[in-house]
UniProtKB/Swiss-Prot annotation:
Record annotation: effect of changing H152A: No change in nuclease activity
EC number(s) per entry: 3.1.11.-, 3.1.13.-
GO biological process, one term: response to hydrogen peroxide
Obligatory cofactor(s): Mg(2+); Mn(2+)
Stated family: Belongs to the metallo-dependent hydrolases superfamily. TatD-type hydrolase family. TatD subfamily.
Main location group: cytoplasm
GO cellular component terms, A-Z: cytoplasm; cytosol
Annotated protein name in UniProt: 3'-5' ssDNA/RNA exonuclease TatD
Cofactor note: No activity in the presence of Ca(2+) or Zn(2+).
Main function: 3'-5' exonuclease that prefers single-stranded DNA and RNA. May play a role in the H(2)O(2)-induced DNA damage repair.
InterPro entries in alphabetical order: DNase_TatD-rel_CS (IPR018228), Exonuc_TatD (IPR024918), Metal_Hydrolase (IPR032466), TatD-like (IPR001130), TatD-type_Hydrolase (IPR050891)
Keywords (A to Z) from UniProt: Cytoplasm, Exonuclease, Hydrolase, Magnesium, Manganese, Metal-binding, Nuclease
Subunit structure, as described in the record: Monomer.
Gene it is expressed from: tatD
Length: 260
């Protein structure tokens, strides 16, 4: 099983990053996609992907950091995307929940990254929170120019999920679905996601599954917890976990064009 969203550049992994990666593979994870959320972290993600086997990375600027976007950023992302470890542009998108960057800054950076991905024929790794309508309005003109797209860490509604799938967008599901307080709506729509459009991820070190036992004392999520998330998703979808792991692995290979 492949974890499509690991924030391995996080300072929470600074002291034991090697062990975190080793534990993930020991647990049955067979590949990691390391998320780039700004230029510096995208550069670090690429270096980590080169350092560890069966790891790849994204290059992009998260909506929170969109105020940093400028011509030099764009040039650096394009240069970074030429590295073989980098297999997607992002994390890019819109987040109108907290607006760490203004909506205008977010939209400018998002469209610029969609253009880069289209020009380079690379898939996009996307983020959307409290911005679905505007997100789709900006994205739709680019979809026929992109080889693929995934909306990672999906936490939206049934209607939003169906709109994404209708446009061929992959849906990334995290341990959010294991949260009995805020993940129930997502849990209910799991069976509606076509298996050929489903991807799984931890978003580590964030979103530690609430039903994980025993819980780590650090409360830090790790890619080694992906098998737990997979098992729960398979249970709620009424599918065999091994079949779902193989299916989502095939989806990863199709979307990102990688072999593992």
């Amino acid at each position: 099983m492949f974890d499509i969203g690991v924030n391995l550049t996080s300072s929470q992994f600074a002291k034991d990053r090697d062990d975190v990666v080793a534990c993930a593979f020991d647990a049955g994870v067979n590949g990691l996609l390391i998320t780039g959320t700004n230029l510096r972290e995208s550069q670090q993600a690429q270096k980590l992907a080169r350092q560890y086997s069966s790891c790849w990375s994204t290059a992009g600027v998260h909506p929170h950091d969109s105020s940093q976007w400028q011509a030099a950023t764009e040039e650096a992302i394009i240069e970074l995307a030429a590295q073989p470890e980098v297999v997607a542009i992002g994390e890019c998108g819109l987040d109108f929940n907290r607006n760490f960057s203004t909506p205008e800054e977010q939209e400018r950076a998002f469209v610029a990254q969609l253009r880069i991905a289209a020009d380079l024929n690379m898939p996009v790794f996307m983020h959307c929170r409290d911005a679905h309508e505007r997100f789709m309005t900006l994205l739709e003109p680019w979809l026929d120019k992109l080889p693929g797209a995934v909306l990672h860490c999906f936490t939206g509604t049934r209607e939003e999920m169906q709109a994404c799938v209708a446009h061929g967008i992959y849906i990334g599901i995290t341990g959010w679905v294991c949260d009995e307080r805020r993940g129930l709506e997502l849990r209910e729509l799991l069976p509606l996601i076509p298996a050929e459009k489903l991807l799984i991820e931890t978003d580590a070190p964030y979103l530690l599954p609430r039903d994980l036992t025993p819980k780590p004392s650090s409360r830090r999520n790790e890619p080694a917890h992906l098998p737990h998330i997979l098992q729960r998703i398979a249970h709620w979808r009424g599918e065999d976990a091994a079949w779902l792991a193989a299916t989502t692995d095939a989806n990863v290979k199709t979307l990102f064009g990688i072999a593992f």
